[in-house]
């Protein structure tokens, strides 16, 4: 009985105090916005890109340009909101590393994505570029794959 009353009291307080609710339950965190990974937010939540990409693959995501918004919910699940096919943009492939090639020197002109933070940039053959967002030097060819449902 005491536990039930304590639980009801806490739930009532949380219903009347947003700060207390945030303290006890946490806040949902936007981890992908407009196809761009917020890797610093993932790391703050002690989640690696590998774990996150696995969760996205389970949700039929092949590349980040398919994702308009992804939210790490307070219960650990990931909510994914997709672009319609006609709005899908080039993005970082989230297939496992052995399925994609990484470059420090760009082999041919095209659109490439930083393998760490997912920023997408046009690059020329022979170019060696440090990512302006995260200072990483590795790039992969950006994917334009649409979702298959």
Question: Locations of the language-model features?
Answer:
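Transmembrane alpha-helices and immediately adjacent membrane-cytoplasm interface residues
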Residues: 1-25
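Membrane-cytosol interface motif
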Residues: 22-42
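ATP-binding catalytic core of ATPases
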Residues: 49-51
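A broadly conserved sequence feature marking short terminus-proximal activation segments
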Residues: 53-109, 145-146
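Flanking scaffold residues of small Cys/His-coordinated metal-binding clusters
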Residues: 108-112, 126
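Short Cys/His-rich "knuckle" micro-motifs
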Residues: 122-128, 140-145
